[in-house]
Each structure stands twice: as C-alpha cells, then as structure tokens.
A protein has these predicted regions:
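Residues that form generic nucleotide/phosphate-binding pockets
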Residues: 90, 178, 182, 226
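Alpha/beta enzyme core
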Residues: 1-137, 151, 155-156, 160
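Exposed alpha-helical structural elements
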Residues: 83-86, 178, 215
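Catalytic-face loop-and-helix region of soluble metabolic enzyme cores
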Residues: 111, 121, 128-208
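Extended, intrinsically disordered, low-complexity segments
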Residues: 185-238
Length: 238
C-alpha cells in the first residue's frame, strides 16, 4: 500500500488525481489495537490524497489468496459492539473510510446452509456506536465473503449500513463456467487429437473468453439487483 500511496502523492503534486480512489488495508489478523494504530496512519495519508480507505476488524473465515483462517478461534469470526466502538474512536475524524466488520462471513464456496451469518451483529454494533456518539457516527459497512449468501441475509445487512459487498468467488465461477462448457462441447476442435489440426475458431481465446465476460456481466447485474442498486447511480435513478 505504501508504494501506491507514494505514487498517488507524486501524481497529486503534479496536479493530477490519485492513482486509485480507494485502498484496502486488512489488519484483521492483528490485535485490534495494533490494527487501529496502523489504520490511523494509513487513513491520515489517504485523507491527504482524497482517497477512501477500507479497513477490516474481525477475521473472515475460509481461505483467500493462500491465506487460510481455519485455525482461528471462533470468537474472532464475529466483530463485537465493543470492537465497533473502538474502531469509531480510533478513526473518526481522520478521513473517509469504510469498515468491514465480520458476522460469520467466509471466503471461498460452501454448500447452502453451511455458513451461518449473523447480520444482527452489524445492527448491534451500529447501535452501540450510535448510542455513545450519535446517529452521524454510523459506519458505512462492507460485506466481505458475500458469495453464495442468501438474499434475505444480504437484504438484511443493507438495513444495517452495508454499502459494498465482495463476491469474488461467485464472479470467478460465473466467468469460468461457460468456458468449461465451450471446451467440453468443442473438445475435438479445441485439441489437436490424433494428428488432426483442431478448429481455430474454437481454440481462439476470443471465442470463449467473450462468453466468460458475458456471463460475468450477468452475475454483476444480479448483484446489483440483490443490493437494490440496479438502475441507480450516485446522481439518482436512471
């Protein structure tokens, strides 16, 4: 993150915009106090550059990018109201940030019913912060590990302040599935079998990557519907 901020700092000094409009720092594996100390410093740097910082407290279960949290104690999978109050006290007033609190959410794919989300954790945490610091203290929350979640859970989190949901696993599958179908249905054209030459039209990457892109776009459209943001922009409804 530091090199990216430095690149943005140089761009801003030249009268340009920052390299990115937002960054994420995941210090959830650290003790909360250490996490917040690092987050405060990064948020201050981001604020100077008009960059939003996304931070995380509480551990999202499962595995992501080779990082496995299966050995983490169960209580670490749930952000407490006290945690949320501490995050507010640590970061309020420094700059614009989003907060990924954890409520049983996990990375990677699980069978339906295997993941037990507790969206009420977000409700309770927001209430604790609001009771102490007022309605303006409510967080803009991020839902990590949203792939495969029940629509009812997704919609419930929206009422508790979720403004962003991550669905990396779902979009990966949406992209890959039609490509697999293409290969299976055109196996003799994709491969050069028994001295045959195959079919360039079927092994041309453009022929199947386009299908992946189209299916991913459909999954993204569904996500917009799930999050009640379809046909909406930051300027209003279209």
């Amino acid at each position: 993150l530091k090199p990216l901020l430095e690149a943005s700092r140089k761009r801003v000094a030249e009268g340009k915009g920052p390299l990115f409009q937002s960054h994420m720092f995941d210090g959830s594996i650290l003790p909360l106090e250490e996490n917040m100390e690092i987050s405060k410093k990064l948020l201050a740097e981001c604020a100077e550059l008009d960059i939003i910082l996304e931070i995380e407290a509480g551990v999202v279960g499962g595995e992501e990018d080779g990082h496995d949290t299966s050995g983490i104690p169960a209580e670490k999978l749930y952000t407490t109201p006290e945690d949320m109050v501490q995050v507010h006290e640590s970061l309020n007033g420094i700059g614009r940030f989003l907060f990924a609190a954890t409520f049983g959410n996990v990375h990677v794919a699980y069978k339906p019913g295997a993941v037990q989300l507790k969206p009420a954790i977000l409700k309770d945490g927001q209430a604790a912060v609001e009771a102490k610091y007022g309605a303006e203290s409510r967080f803009d929350l991020v839902f990590h590990g949203g792939s495969g979640s029940d629509l009812s859970d997704i919609r419930e989190t929206l009422g508790y302040g979720v403004v962003k949901m991550n669905i990396d696993t779902d979009t990966q599958y949406a992209f890959t599935r039609p490509i697999v179908t293409h290969v299976c249905e055109n196996i003799e054209g994709v491969l050069k079998i028994e001295d045959e030459v195959g079919n360039k039209k079927t092994y041309d990457p453009r022929s199947y990557l386009k299908k992946g892109e189209q299916n991913m776009s459909l999954r993204m459209a569904k996500a917009c519907e799930d999050l009640c943001s379809d046909r909406k922009t930051i300027f209003g409804t279209v």
